[in-house]
């Protein structure tokens, strides 16, 4: 049976992640309160941030930036948007 969590991002009960996606306290916090669906949304957003900002993941500053954005995306006021990005109309 799948592990269910009350997803902090989607505000509903949904299937939880199989394991903490990051090391440390942030990974544990995400594992406890973020669903697979919300994590998949973050991965898409993270990819957009990496591409649009031309982040070099070998650079420690870029990795720190993404960790801060991860925390803001789930537990803060929301992550940065890529400059010039316009969300599709639904």
From Swiss-Prot:
SUPFAM superfamilies: YggX-like (SSF111148). InterPro entries: Fe_traffick_prot_YggX, Fe_traffick_prot_YggX_sf. GO terms for molecular function: iron ion binding. One of its GO terms (cellular component) is cytosol. Disulfide bonds: none annotated. It comes from the Bacteria. GO terms for biological process: cellular response to oxidative stress. The keyword GTP-binding does not apply. Could be a mediator in iron transactions between iron acquisition and iron-requiring processes, such as synthesis and/or repair of Fe-S clusters in biosynthetic enzymes. Belongs to the Fe(2+)-trafficking protein family. HAMAP family: Fe_traffic_YggX. This is Probable Fe(2+)-trafficking protein.
């Amino acid at each position: 049976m799948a592990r269910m969590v009350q997803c902090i991002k989607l505000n509903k009960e949904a299937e939880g992640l199989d394991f903490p996606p990051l090391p440390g306290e942030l990974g544990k916090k995400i594992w406890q309160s973020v669903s697979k669906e919300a994590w998949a949304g973050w991965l898409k957003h993270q990819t957009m941030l990496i591409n649009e900002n031309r982040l070099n993941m070998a650079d420690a500053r870029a990795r720190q930036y993404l960790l801060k954005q991860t925390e803001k995306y789930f537990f803060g006021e929301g992550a940065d948007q890529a400059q010039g990005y316009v969300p599709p109309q639904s």
